[in-house]
Each structure stands twice: as structure tokens, then as C-alpha cells.
Amino acid sequence: TLAQRIATGFHRNTQINTEGGVDKEQFRVDSIFDRIATTGEVMFGLTLGCAQCHDHKFDPISQVEYYRLFAFFNNADEPRLEAPTAEVLARRAEHGARVKQLETELSALAKEDAKRKPLEASLAKLKKARPSAATTLVMAKRGKPRTTRRFVQGDFTRPAEEMQPGTPSVLHRLAQPDGNRLDFARWVADRNNP
């Protein structure tokens, strides 16, 4: 549903830096690190950030388990989602009907008809005036999966072994670990989650 897609925006609440010179891959990886830290603190009461670079010294989380969590978020894209209200949808329907009407009128005119040029200009102007809707940041399944690797000392330029999605052993087990963010969300919301 639209509400479920909008809810994925919780994980888009990371630092955003679009300044020139930003390494896009480093920014993407840093955003995932931030998502994992937020998920751990908010949903599990655990600080997971230390395990980004090494096995956690206080919480029973290994670096391998950290990157297994990383794998859940690594295969997501970060699009904007349009969320039109009922009013905007109604205005768009009216707008679409008017566009269709002008297109029909245009198709009935001969190529040399003097009325054609002003009608084409009106149609172009009308198409640009399509009612807009609010947008929100969401997460979506990536079309082409990325390979997830553990990073030596948390450095994305030093990839190590390949990692499969999974959850920390200190928490209850994920029944079907197939790398799906929806399965992860269901696991987080499970009654067995502390």
C-alpha cells in the first residue's frame, strides 16, 4: 500500500550531502551505516556502530553479524515517491480530460490549418501545468542486486568476504533469511523481538 511504502521513509532519515566532490558510493555506504545504527538503537536497544569496524566490545554483536544486517539494506534504491491527495487526483483527472480534448481537436485538423499552431501551443502549455503532488523519500527494492561484503575496519574501499543477510545471534532467529527487507521488517515487528 501507499502507507507501507511511505513508512519505508523512516530509513531515509539519514544525513544527506549532495555537495560537489562527494563520493557517491561512500555516501551510500555511510547512509546504510546510519540506518543500522538507528535500527539497533531504536528497535533493539543495542548500539551496533562499533561492530562496523570490529566485534563489539560490550554488546554481543560480531562484525560478521553487523554486515549480515548491512546486507538487508544494501539492495535498496532510494527513490522519491509521489503521494497525491484525493484533491490532486481529481484535478489531474480534469487536467487529463482537457489534454485529451485538445489532442482530439488537433488530430481533426489538417496539418496546414491556421488553428493548429495556437492549439499546439495551448496543448504544450497545458501539459506543463499538470497538477503536482507532494513527494516523500522512500526505499524500494533494487532491480539488480548488489553483492554485500564485510569491510575491513569499516572501510568501504577494503572489501573482504561476501556476506548473506542475517540477524544477530543474540536476538531471535529470522525464520527465512532470504535477504528480503520485508522479511526483515516482519522479523523486527515479531512478538519475539525483545
Name each region found by the language model.
Residues 2-13, 80-194:
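Short, functional "switch" segments adjacent to catalytic/cofactor/reactive centers
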Residues 3-97:
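Sequence context surrounding c-type heme c attachment/ligation sites in exported
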